[in-house]
Amino acid sequence: TEHHWDAASGLAPEALRTALLKIEQDMSGQPAIAVKTRLYEKVLASAQLDVDSRDFFPEKLNHDFLLSRIRGRWIVDFRAREMADLLAGTEAATEGLCYTGDADFGHTSPDWQALLTLGIPGLRARLLAARDAKTTLTEEQRLFYACAADTLTATIGFIARLADATDRLAAAGDDKMRLVSSSLRQLTVGAPETLLEAMQLSVIFYNLQCNVERDAVRSLGGLDRQFYPFYRR
């Protein structure tokens, strides 16, 4: 697919790469979950957009898989240190034709029903409610909840960027973009209410998981059952 990146909408990949490497350097020694969250925020807030007036489902970011490349370095290092003995054992078992096994950091199974029922704002609210319901939290748990909430906030911000970009096309007289923008705007404040909004949210969420974070989403299916309630409305 040919992309038409809006140069005024954000940083080109090389400038984005410089910004991400600085974040990584400045946060050296901090937990990986904290560093990754800040990197994710920067990509979603700053990468260039491609919003096409022919497209009902804008979601494109000019990020050059930079977050994935950085994370890939971490995984190589982790395999060489913490997992070295374990992986040596699985390699021997593989060579002996006992079984095949390897480290896997990249498969997720999102709860699509929860996503479509709650939306990103609802998922964030549920997360914070779960945190607040706990009487005591370790520092590790506090960090997890904070990073998860920040990740969802960044996702809402990205959808708002898409809504702003489609707003500009709508202002030029494009009625289709007016509909697209209105639907995207709904996703920044609540759950999807229409079929278009449900489809938009699914496309955006899938893209962010698979292309920005580079996780292999293994639970996208049953779209007839997922979308049918919205179709009936």
Show which residues each predicted segment covers.
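Long, non-catalytic protein-protein interaction scaffolds
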Residues: 1-131, 135
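Structured, charged N-terminal subsegments at the starts of enzyme catalytic cores
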Residues: 124-233
